[in-house]
Structure formats: structure tokens, C-alpha cells
Amino acid sequence: MKTFPVSIVTPDGPVYEKEVEMVSVKAESGEMGILPGHIPTVAPLKISAVRLKNGGHTDYVAVSGGFIEVRPDKVTVLATSAEEANHIDTHRANEAKRRAEQRLQDKQAHVDFKRAELALKRAINRLDVSNMK
């Protein structure tokens, strides 16, 4: 099957750069599957896993928002943060989850609940993706 280059980039630099047959992402508008020759598109991403298929193998990358830019010959994900499944520190992710849950349970006025909810979603996503290795 035909392949195309995919780059997943964060403000800290590239996280993933390979040729793949298909990319699946969760955009704000819904799930997107991208094959070679896809029409040009730009879409905001949810906190989720990016699935990258090549042959019988699938790579998973946890992304925390950002955008996907699709061109007929290349796909670029510009993510706020991103980690490949095999690089996720599950101990750190569990600690972040615990802290976010604690902040959400505190009924104090100074707690930013939206920020705590996003931290919880990011931690859960990282843990889910780490199990997809």
C-alpha cells in the first residue's frame, strides 16, 4: 500500500517522523481517518491518541490538543504536547491523575476546575495510550 510522511511536532521539537499508510485522529468535529491523497484539511484536535498504521504495525502517540494539517502528500500534527506510547512514564501519569482528581474533589474557591479537568483528561489519555504499546 502507498505511504506518506507524517510528522508530530511540539514546541519542544519533533516527536514522531515516519512514513505510514494511515493516520487516525480525534478532531473536535469527530474521528478522522487519513489515507494517501487525502484532500487538504486543517482541524483542531482533542486530547486523544493518534494512531499511525503501517503494514501490520500500529504506533500510538498521546497528544494534548493542537491541530492537524493534511496535505495530499504529507500530514503534520502540531501538538501542545505529545508522547509515543513506549516513552510514557506511567508512574508520572498516575501521579498527575491523582493530583488532578484531588484538585477536583477540593471544594476550594481558588481551584481552577477547568484546568484540573484538562489535567485529568491528559493524564488519563497518557495512561490509555501507554497501554496500547
Curated annotation (Swiss-Prot):
Please give the Gene3D superfamilies that the UniProt record associates with this protein.
Answer: ATP synthase delta/epsilon subunit, C-terminal domain (1.20.5.440), F0F1 ATP synthase delta/epsilon subunit, N-terminal (2.60.15.10)
Q: Name one Pfam family in it.
A: ATP-synt_DE
Q: Where in the cell is it found?
A: Cell membrane
Does the record carry 4Fe-4S as a key word?
A: no
Which UniProt keywords are listed? ATP synthesis, Cell membrane, CF(1), Hydrogen ion transport, Ion transport, Membrane, Transport
UniProt membrane topology term: Peripheral membrane protein
Signal peptide limits:
none
Superkingdom per UniProt: Bacteria
Q: Name one GO molecular function term.
A: ATP binding
Q: Which InterPro entries match?
A: ATP_F1_dsu/esu_C_sf, ATP_synth_F1_dsu/esu, ATP_synth_F1_dsu/esu_N, ATP_synth_F1_esu_C, ATPsynth_dsu/esu_N
Q: How does it assemble?
A: F-type ATPases have 2 components, CF(1) - the catalytic core - and CF(0) - the membrane proton channel. CF(1) has five subunits: alpha(3), beta(3), gamma(1), delta(1), epsilon(1). CF(0) has three main subunits: a, b and c.
Primary role: Produces ATP from ADP in the presence of a proton gradient across the membrane.
| Family, as annotated | Belongs to the ATPase epsilon chain family.
Protein's recorded name: ATP synthase epsilon chain
- State the species of origin: Bacillus cytotoxicus (strain DSM 22905 / CIP 110041 / 391-98 / NVH 391-98)
